[in-house]
Regions:
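Short acidic, glycine-rich surface-loop motifs adjacent to enzyme active sites
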Residues: 138-148
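Divalent-metal-activated hydrolytic enzyme cores
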Residues: 115, 162-201
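Histidine/lysine/aspartate-rich catalytic loop segments that bind and position anionic ligands
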Residues: 81-135, 139
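Charged, compositionally biased N-terminal leader segments and the immediate start
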Residues: 1-8
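A short amphipathic alpha-helix within small helical-bundle interaction modules
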Residues: 21, 28-42
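Charged helix-capping and loop-helix junction motifs
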Residues: 124-126, 155-162
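Long, charged amphipathic helices and adjacent flexible linkers at domain junctions
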Residues: 60-81
Length: 201
């Protein structure tokens, strides 16, 4: 961390700043996941340092995405979860993605649907349906994260799942799963019994 900060302040002593960041955010992961506005509250962290720190998880996310893209057939909860995990790496707020699949369960696209709180009102069904139709998807997997909690479905998650399932069915598209991510863990609402297994139909 000290070496990284040096690139933002090459003439300064970055050791105290590195220690201050770790003291405030607890771990390296905490530092790299912190919002830019919170990073700049630490003495010695200016715009350049905050932007550089926030760049690290973005680069890591891209590297992990390129690795997960090697999973060709996404026909199980495990494969879908592993494919989607990198999209949430380093995110400090809730984000929603829609993984669009063709008839052979190959990824067509993974679309950012929403950033912010997850509920029926915030995730417009028409936006999800449009993204699925634009990708010419046969089925889709909805995914969102719980950045400060456990990967467990809330009542709102279940309600959102059922609303979107009905909206997608109306245009002939299967909601194959709704995956919830927290850190490096994920759970499936299909495995939870909220959705039928489309691969057993």
């Amino acid at each position: 961390l000290e070496v990284l900060l040096y690139y933002a302040a090459p003439r300064g002593d970055t050791n105290p700043t590195a220690h201050a960041l770790l003291s405030r955010f607890g771990t390296l992961d905490g530092v790299f996941s912190a919002p830019e506005s919170e990073l700049k509250k630490v003495n010695g962290v200016g715009d350049a340092a905050a932007q550089l720190i926030r760049l690290v998880p973005q680069v890591a996310r891209r590297c992990l995405m390129s690795r997960s893209a090697q999973i060709e057939i996404l026909d199980t909860t495990s494969k879908c979860g592993q494919y989607l995990l990198p999209y949430f790496h380093g995110e400090s707020e809730e984000v929603v993605y829609l993984l669009c699949l063709d008839a052979k369960c190959k990824a067509l696209d993974c679309v950012l649907i929403h950033r912010g709180g997850v509920n029926v009102a915030s995730i417009a069904a028409r936006k999800v349906v449009k993204a699925a139709l634009d990708a010419n998807a046969t089925s889709v997997v909805l995914a969102h994260n719980h950045p400060s909690g456990l990967a467990l479905p809330s009542p709102e998650d279940r309600q959102t799942t059922l609303v979107l399932k009905a909206a997608l069915e109306a245009v002939g598209i299967v909601l194959a799963d709704h995956i919830i991510v927290a850190d490096d863990d994920f759970v499936s609402l299909r495995d939870d019994g909220i959705l039928e297994d489309p691969y057993e139909l």
